[in-house]
């Protein structure tokens, strides 16, 4: 059964200075967690906050630094939204984000083009990692004990990476952006970090053709990631009935698109499609999604005044 009841009190202050070139925001926040799931001696957490940016004379180059921390109250809902296959037997803890910082540069060359490049570093205690549960020989037909669900393991995790973003804005309705993030993870004791991809790519595009046709498209790529694999063995060989090893789960590449034709103020003709183009169709090992989904139809918007 779930064991969780928690809240927190929060106090925050900040100093803001906005100049023509230099923008400076400094502050801090204090958090006091409470609840029957808290330790016997709960602590008071203080996190600093800093946002600094500086515009060059032309305004086309803006170096920036963002730094903060936080105390994230996890829940079964938040875990299940990220991983719908978590078992309903989680010991839920809050995540202490001790450091979260980005240092980089924004560039605006002109003609609607903008670039962003930054280095990222974060360090968290009680960072949630999803680990595949083994097959339980004494499961008594309990659904989530058939090696088909995930538990949450908490540990200290460092995250380091490089993020690049390019955006081209042609007009108010026409733009395209591409963001790429490459990350390295470090866990206490040099243990494996499960189900976290080192490479993520996101593509988004919006276009309006004339005054009646709207087109949207997006693409998402997540790279390979490590996952726990449980191999059933005889109870004589292993008392748990499982042998645990690490496997690599293949990358996933998906695209989504939609086209809307506005016939008039109330009637729309539309098409929506989702396609997964990789051999692996799910972020989670041994779960697969439909590789293609297509929907088309006509939409009527009611004008109801109460």
Model-derived features: where do they sit?
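Outer-membrane beta-barrel transmembrane domain signature of Gram-negative proteins
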Residues: 1-20
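Exposed, low-structure sequence patches enriched in small/polar residues
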Residues: 21-23, 27-306
């Amino acid at each position: 059964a779930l064991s969780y009841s928690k809240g927190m009190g929060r106090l925050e202050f900040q100093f803001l200075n906005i100049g023509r070139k230099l923008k400076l925001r400094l502050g801090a926040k204090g958090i006091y967690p409470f609840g029957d799931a808290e330790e016997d001696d709960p602590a008071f957490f203080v996190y600093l906050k800093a946002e600094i940016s500086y515009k060059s004379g032309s305004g086309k180059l803006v170096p920036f630094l963002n730094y903060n921390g936080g105390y994230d109250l996890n829940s079964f809902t938040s875990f299940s939204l990220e991983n719908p296959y978590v078992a309903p037997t989680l010991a839920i803890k809050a995540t202490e984000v001790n450091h979260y910082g980005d240092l980089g540069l924004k560039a605006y060359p002109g003609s609607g083009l903008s670039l962003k490049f930054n280095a990222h570093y974060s360090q968290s205690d009680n960072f949630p990692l999803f680990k595949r549960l083994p097959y339980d020989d004494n499961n008594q037909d309990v659904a989530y004990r058939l090696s088909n669900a995930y538990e949450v393991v908490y540990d200290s995790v460092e995250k380091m990476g490089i993020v690049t973003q390019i955006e081209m804005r042609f007009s108010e309705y026409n733009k395209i952006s591409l963001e790429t993030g490459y990350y390295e993870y470090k866990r206490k004791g040099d243990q494996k970090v499960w189900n976290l991809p080192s490479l993520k790519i996101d593509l988004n595009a919006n276009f309006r053709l004339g005054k009646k046709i709207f087109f949207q498209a997006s693409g998402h790529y997540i790279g390979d990631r490590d996952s726990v694999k449980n191999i059933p063995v005889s109870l004589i060989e292993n008392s748990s009935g499982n042998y645990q090893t690490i496997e690599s789960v293949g990358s996933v590449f998906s695209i989504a698109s939609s086209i809307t034709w506005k016939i008039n103020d109330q009637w729309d003709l539309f098409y929506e499609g989702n396609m997964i183009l990789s051999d692996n169709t799910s972020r989670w090992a041994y779960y697969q999604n439909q590789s293609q989904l297509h929907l088309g139809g006509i939409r009527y918007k009611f004008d109801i005044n109460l």
